[in-house]
């Protein structure tokens, strides 16, 4: 009898162990769990989010919203040894709809509940009973990226499907988004939003954080997986499964949003001690055929859309080229420390276009630059689309380019002139562009290398002069191109690349001179 009891006990223990092993190995939250919800939503009518925000928060100004601060002592995971911490955004202003935030552990999913005790409200007068059941507007991720004993914010997810990410020594600048719909179309843009998040609790030794998100909008839903890998360059690995509810005019995949107010290619119309003011100064593209393209940004007087058609893009990004503080001179906003963002597709994305949208703006508070990939063909509503890519947030722009291919260091615009016999320069009605090219391999070339430029211009202009000379300061080459515009009320397209005989030395400088009206 005793032997039978021991055998039964051993069998029970064995079954318990097997059950534990089965449970721990088979249960795991994944993007497929989010995709099921996204696909289910796509088959139903869209339900607009409802705001539960009291008017004192909904109608507040930005200065008041800034007074609502998260209490750092109450950071989520503060009592765990994980290097990652979470803090949350309170609702206020146009952040007036709650998002659900969940924690994923090895065995369960747990809702992170809102509590006003997480926050200090400064001088904002409010009734505590009216806020006790509010939700969060978003969240931020903290990590000791600059110092082992200090947690710095590295990710912010707040508003629609926007998120911002930085690496070591960087400050927030441009944003990424989950999805863009009908950007710059006359019908108006649709802004999908992340309505729910699932964040995996990291282990003490983890150097990456996994975040899942459910996206929703009137005409699309989506499931997203973000793996954040902080470092000198912070890299975000993105996987998305997108479902259309209804047909869209244009789908923007891996969208980036930035700001360009003025720079040397388009100087400020008013006197300003800051020579440049922008989060990014150009769109870089690595096309499917291997060509590298650089499109300097503008702040046009009218909406401008540029489209670069290709098959299977190798990468694109909005970059901040030129890191010298003297280029910006802004002690408050430190544009010299703002990151570039580079999208690297995984797999073949097929035929489509990298599009750049430039929107007029009068000040730096408005994001007026958008770049994204838009596929030529979209599936019928309900069918799944898969996109995988990484976004690298970096201040090392030269590493975001092929080392054997020279890149544009800067583009400067000037009044075109001709040196007279008396050595005085006389304006001749042209516009001059001074374009400096540099690169690791280019610096190795002897200065007497016969570098020339291949240039072209659209129907609205004429190239009057094009010269290339060695630049001993940058150990690169400088292109000076004088152009005559036929109709100033129209845009003018220009292209240029440096060559040595039949060898291409540089990326293609592709510039659009905005209409001046």
Curated annotation (Swiss-Prot):
Pfam families with a match to the protein in the record: MdoG
Location(s), subcellular: Periplasm
GO function terms (MF aspect): carbohydrate binding; catalytic activity
A biological process term (GO) from this entry: beta-glucan biosynthetic process
Keyword Signal: yes
Leader peptide range in chain numbering: 1-28
Pathway assignment: Glycan metabolism; osmoregulated periplasmic glucan (OPG) biosynthesis
Keywords: Periplasm, Signal
Stated family: Belongs to the OpgD/OpgG family.
PANTHER family listed in its UniProt record: GLUCANS BIOSYNTHESIS PROTEIN (PTHR30504), GLUCANS BIOSYNTHESIS PROTEIN G (PTHR30504:SF4)
HAMAP family from the UniProt entry: MdoG_OpgG
Name the record gives this protein: Glucans biosynthesis protein G
Organism of derivation: Escherichia coli O1:K1 / APEC
């Amino acid at each position: 009898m005793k032997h039978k009891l021991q055998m039964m006990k051993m069998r029970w223990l064995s079954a318990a162990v097997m059950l534990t092993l089965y449970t721990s190995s088979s249960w795991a939250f994944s993007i497929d769990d989010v995709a099921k919800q996204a696909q289910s939503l796509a088959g139903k009518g869209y339900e607009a989010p409802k705001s539960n925000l009291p008017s004192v928060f909904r109608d507040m100004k930005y200065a008041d919203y800034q007074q609502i601060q998260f209490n750092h002592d109450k950071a989520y995971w503060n009592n765990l040894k994980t290097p990652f911490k979470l803090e949350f955004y309170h609702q206020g202003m146009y952040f007036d709809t709650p998002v659900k935030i969940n924690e994923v552990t090895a065995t369960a999913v747990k809702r992170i509940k809102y509590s006003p005790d997480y926050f200090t409200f400064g001088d904002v007068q409010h009734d505590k009973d009216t806020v006790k059941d509010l939700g969060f507007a978003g969240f931020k991720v903290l990590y000791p990226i600059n110092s082992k004993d200090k947690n710095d914010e590295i990710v912010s997810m707040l508003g629609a499907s926007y998120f911002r990410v930085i690496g070591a020594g960087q400050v927030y600048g441009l944003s990424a988004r989950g999805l863009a719909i009908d950007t710059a179309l006359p019908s108006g843009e649709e802004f999908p939003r992340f309505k729910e998040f699932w964040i995996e609790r990291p282990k003490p030794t983890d150097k990456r954080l996994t975040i899942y998100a459910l996206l929703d909008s009137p005409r699309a839903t989506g499931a997203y997986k973000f793996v954040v890998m902080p470092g000198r360059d912070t890299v975000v690995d993105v996987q998305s499964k997108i479902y259309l509810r209804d047909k869209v005019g244009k789908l923007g995949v891996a969208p980036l949003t930035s700001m360009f107010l003025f720079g040397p290619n388009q100087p400020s119309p008013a006197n300003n001690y800051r020579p440049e003011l922008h989060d990014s100064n150009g769109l870089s593209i690595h096309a499917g055929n291997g060509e590298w393209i650089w499109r300097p940004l503008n702040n046009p007087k009218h909406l401008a859309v540029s489209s670069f058609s290709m098959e299977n893009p190798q990468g694109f990004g909005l970059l901040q080229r030129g890191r010298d503080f003297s280029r910006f001179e802004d002690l408050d906003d430190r544009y010299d420390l703002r990151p570039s963002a580079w999208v690297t597709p995984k797999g073949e994305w097929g035929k489509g276009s990298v599009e750049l949208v430039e929107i007029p703006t009068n000040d730096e508070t408005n994001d007026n630059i958008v770049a994204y990939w838009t596929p030529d063909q979209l599936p019928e509503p309900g069918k799944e689309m898969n996109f995988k890519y990484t976004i690298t947030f970096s201040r090392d722009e030269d590493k975001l380019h092929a080392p054997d291919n020279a890149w544009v260091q800067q583009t400067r615009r000037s009044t075109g002139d001709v040196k007279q016999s008396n050595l005085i320069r006389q304006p001749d009605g042209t516009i001059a562009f001074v374009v400096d090219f540099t690169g690791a391999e280019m610096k190795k070339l002897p200065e007497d290398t016969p570098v020339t430029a291949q240039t072209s211009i659209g129907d609205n202009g004429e190239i009057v002069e094009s010269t290339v000379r060695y630049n001993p300061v940058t150990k690169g080459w400088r292109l000076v191109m004088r152009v005559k515009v036929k109709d100033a009320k129209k845009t003018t397209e220009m292209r240029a690349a440096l060559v040595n005989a039949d060898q291409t030395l540089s990326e293609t400088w592709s510039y659009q001179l905005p209409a001046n009206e």
